[in-house]
Amino acid sequence: MEKRRAVKENYPDIIDIWSKSVEHTHDFLEKDDFEQIKQVIPQYLDVLDVQLWYRHGEIIGFSALSKDHLEMLFLDPFYQGKGHGTTIIQIMINEGLKTVDVNEQNLGAYLFYKARGFRQIGRDEKDSEGRDYPILHMSL
C-alpha cells in the first residue's frame, strides 16, 4: 500500500471515487443532498490533509484528515471488503489518528470502525450542515 499527498489535479479522481463509494454505501442519502455535497467537496479538500491510496500503481481510494480526526475515507467499491480499508486505517492509527465521525445510517462504516477499536463517544441529530443525517462521533 502506498500513499501520496493529493493535489488539485487529483480532485476529479477523488470526486469520482467519492461518488462511486457513496452510491455503493450511502443508500439513505437523498439525491439532492448527494449532489449538494458533491459540489462542495473541493472546498473541503483544500483545507484537509488529503492522501491518495495506491495498490500496484492504481488509485484505490483517498483519505482526508484534520489533525488527528478522520474527515473522509472512501474506497472505490471494487476494492472494498478486501482488507484495504483495514490496512489504511492501521497506517493512519500508527500515524496518530484518534477520532472519526460516521453517519448513523451507515451501519457498515460504524461496524468497520468499531471492529478496529473505535468506540462511540457522542451523537448529533443532524450532520454539520443541518441535514437529517445523525452523526456518531467515535474515538480510540
Predicted features along the sequence, with ranges:
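Conserved GNAT acetyl-CoA-binding A-motif
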Residues: 94-106
